[in-house]
């Protein structure tokens, strides 16, 4: 096998000249494949005497191993070069500024709710919540609202059946609280409520917050003082506030509260009154011992007045151009 060393040398040269993995594979097939030059050397062993064949076979196998080692080394080099070239193409320019992540902001109605909760929390009020699917007793009967009252009509209320409805006010939370807790009581009840109405100033779902105090010797003076302080804090100015006599089935006497707008006109902002004795009796509280006041206000209404929004529906349209103004 005088030319075995020559084959190995040629194989090494071909391996070094291979410029990619595909070309290297062709070299492997040419020398080590089933019909490769070095593989065919094994067929020449039959021409040798039997005693020389083991030594000759060992020489051929060593030559094949040397070529295989050279192939492996060259393959590693080529694969590393290909990987580095690919990484170079995919290199991230770290000097390029990243995309700015825009922070979100609270919805204007949420801002209003948080602001009001903070104010009344400092006065010792607790925040309580209740079910949005309510029964007619807690939504109407316990609040001294008779069966013939217009609020019970289908065109004003979303009914599920004869006794279950989407609550029209958060007053039911007050009833549930008074059923479970004896005075003194000092709570506010924010939440979603539902009315069958939709126009520029009304939506089928809106947010309401009601407040309640029940204790001994609570008077209308306490009610007026509390709401005066609240409105001046909320609007951040020394507003003119007036109380107009009104009617609500669950309070007596009742009033609606107006503030003087910048245009010189009175603007209604909330309703209030002294808790009706029948409401206290319905929850097992003696009206001869305890008295209380309640108030209720629409969160969208107050938000519109605070920020000068003219169309209530804008709060529910998810228009970022509108919402970004309140960040």
From Swiss-Prot:
One of its GO terms (molecular function) is ATP binding. It is found in: Cytoplasm. GO terms for biological process: phenylalanyl-tRNA aminoacylation. PROSITE patterns: AA_TRNA_LIGASE_II (PS50862). Binds 2 magnesium ions per tetramer. Its EC number is 6.1.1.20. Pfam families: Phe_tRNA-synt_N (PF02912), tRNA-synt_2d (PF01409). It comes from the Bacteria. InterPro entries: aa-tRNA-synth_II, aa-tRNA-synth_II/BPL/LPL, Phe-tRNA-synth_IIc_asu, Phe-tRNA_ligase_II_N, Phe_tRNA_ligase_alpha1_bac, Phenylalanyl-tRNA_Synthase, tRNA-bd_arm. Mg(2+) binds at residue 252. Keywords: Aminoacyl-tRNA synthetase, ATP-binding, Cytoplasm, Ligase, Magnesium, Metal-binding, Nucleotide-binding, Protein biosynthesis. It catalyses: tRNA(Phe) + L-phenylalanine + ATP = L-phenylalanyl-tRNA(Phe) + AMP + diphosphate + H(+). GO terms for cellular component: cytoplasm. Belongs to the class-II aminoacyl-tRNA synthetase family. Phe-tRNA synthetase alpha subunit type 1 subfamily. Tetramer of two alpha and two beta subunits. HAMAP family: Phe_tRNA_synth_alpha1. This is Phenylalanine--tRNA ligase alpha subunit. The lineage of its organism: Bacteria, Pseudomonadati, Pseudomonadota, Gammaproteobacteria, Enterobacterales. The gene is pheS.
């Amino acid at each position: 096998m005088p030319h075995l060393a020559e084959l190995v040398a040629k194989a090494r040269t071909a391996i070094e000249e291979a410029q990619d993995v595909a070309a290297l594979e062709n070299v492997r097939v040419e020398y080590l494949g089933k019909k490769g030059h070095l593989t065919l050397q094994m067929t020449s062993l039959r021409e040798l005497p039997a005693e020389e064949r083991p030594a000759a076979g060992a020489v051929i196998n060593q030559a094949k191993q040397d070529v295989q080692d050279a192939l492996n080394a060259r393959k590693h080099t080529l694969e590393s070069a290909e990987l580095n070239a690919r990484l170079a193409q995919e290199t991230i320019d770290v000097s390029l500024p990243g995309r700015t992540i825009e922070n979100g902001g609270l919805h204007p109605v949420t801002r209003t709710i948080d602001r009001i909760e903070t104010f009344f929390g400092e006065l010792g009020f607790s925040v309580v919540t209740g079910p949005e699917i309510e029964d007619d007793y807690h939504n109407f009967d316990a609040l001294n609202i008779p069966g013939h009252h217009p609020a019970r009509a289908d065109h004003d209320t979303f009914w599920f059946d004869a006794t279950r409805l989407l609550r029209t006010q958060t007053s039911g939370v007050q009833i549930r609280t008074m059923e479970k807790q004896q005075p003194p009581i000092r709570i506010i009840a924010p939440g979603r409520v539902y009315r069958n109405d939709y126009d520029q100033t009304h939506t089928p779902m809106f947010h309401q917050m009601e407040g309640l105090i029940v204790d001994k010797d609570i008077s209308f003076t306490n009610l007026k003082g509390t709401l005066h302080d609240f409105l001046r804090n909320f609007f951040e100015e020394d507003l003119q506030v007036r109380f107009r006599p009104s009617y609500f089935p669950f309070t007596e006497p009742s009033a609606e509260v107006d503030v003087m707008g910048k245009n010189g006109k009175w603007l209604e902002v909330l309703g209030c009154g002294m808790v009706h004795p029948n409401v206290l009796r319905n929850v097992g509280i003696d009206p001869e011992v305890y008295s209380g006041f309640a108030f209720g206000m629409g969160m969208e209404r107050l938000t519109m007045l605070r920020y000068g929004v003219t169309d209530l529906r804008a709060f529910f349209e998810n228009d970022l151009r509108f919402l970004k103004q309140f960040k």
